[in-house]
């Protein structure tokens, strides 16, 4: 008999999407006049699918409907922006989502979507691995060729009504600075306090 490892996963009932995210967000929206931050812009909640796409979407769809009053609504011809905009990443069920006339979430696409036909009302974001597109790791010179490539990528997405995010890159200020200058919409980081200081200090 071969040796094997089994991993037992315990799901704690208090650690649900509702308890950790949606309920606290809803409380803030109610307390702040219809916004997560009083007087602030829409808030984005990125949900990364790690399990089978369609069954997960069926469960998530039912959950989101209970919070419809604070969520952005997407349809074939319009987006009704609300306090919280949900975007699904990872193994998301694009065909199932696209088949719905009205939905409470959009999809986080990839660079191929910039050349495809998917509506920005379905694929609202485009996210890519920084290391697959750029050689620069935040040290030394960011070449003009790569800087132009970055800005062209961002401009193309914005022209289509999509927002841009990069993941997998070095989590350093030099990368943040170039992304911010190029108009990248969402800067990925695990250094929240440092990024906050950087953004507040950068015009």
Give, region by region, the residue ranges found by the protein language model:
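Catalytic cores of phosphodiester-bond hydrolases, prominently lipid phosphodiesterases
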Residues: 2-203
